[in-house]
Design a protein with these regions (language model features):
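Single conserved hydrophobic/aromatic residue that forms the stacking wall/gate
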Residues: 1-8, 12
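Short, amphipathic, aromatic/basic-enriched membrane-interface segments that mark the entry/exit
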Residues: 15-25, 112-118, 144-149
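Alpha-helical transmembrane segments of multipass membrane proteins
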Residues: 34-39, 65, 96, 130-134, ...
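Structural signature of hydrophobic alpha-helical transmembrane segments
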Residues: 46-59, 113-125
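C-terminal ends of transmembrane helices
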Residues: 62-78, 82, 130-142
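Transmembrane helix-loop junctions at the membrane interface of multipass transporters and ion channels
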Residues: 69-71, 109, 158-170
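Cytoplasmic-side transmembrane-helix entry/capping segments in multi-pass membrane proteins
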Residues: 78-89, 144-153
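Transmembrane alpha-helix boundary signature
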Residues: 95-110
């Protein structure tokens, strides 16, 4: 494992511990992102889906998990994964409930496009991850860029998972 050797490492460690914490801000933003993204998927509106991605807070515990793995910080990794699990499960549940309540007979292209990932989707995820890392390392980069980048890859597909479960489409 890597050993933190400076005050900067301690600052990063404290920051990542905060980022990994399951708190009210994470829950409210996750629920908001889930509702906006799911409603956008149901309305077949890419603009609304993007709106949901902008508020998703999942980059914070993901970044903390990566930091924990690099330093061998098991406690931080556990906290990060628990926070992410709550985000994924709450998003899946909310999407499932919205899909069940609306009772749409079929889904539009926004949902269907996320049921058959391809290499282009992988490329988008890799570029988004690279931009998220760049934004974290450069304090002058737009801070919302990191959250949006990771949300591109995660929030809408998790919403689609809940919607497909509501239609019993495995």
């Amino acid at each position: 494992t890597l050993e933190p050797s400076s005050a900067a490492s301690d600052v990063y460690k404290r920051q990542h511990m905060r980022d990994a914490t399951l708190d009210e801000v994470f829950i409210v933003l996750s629920i908001g992102a889930s509702l906006i993204s799911t409603l956008g998927l149901l309305a077949n509106s890419s603009a609304v889906v993007i709106g949901g991605m902008v508020v998703a807070p999942w980059i914070m515990p993901l970044r903390a998990a990566a930091f924990a793995i690099l330093l061998g910080e098991v406690r931080l990794l556990g906290r990060s994964l628990r926070t992410l699990l709550v985000g994924v499960l709450s998003t899946t549940l909310l999407s499932f409930l919205l899909g069940s309540v609306t009772g749409l007979p079929q889904f539009g292209t926004e949902v269907l496009a996320r049921t058959s990932p391809n290499l282009l989707d992988l490329g988008i995820a890799l570029v988004a991850g690279g931009l998220a890392t760049y934004a974290k390392l450069r304090s002058d980069a737009v801070s919302s860029l990191a959250g949006t980048a990771i949300a591109v890859a995660l929030v809408p597909p998790v919403c689609v998972m809940g919607l497909l479960l509501s239609h019993q489409s495995w």
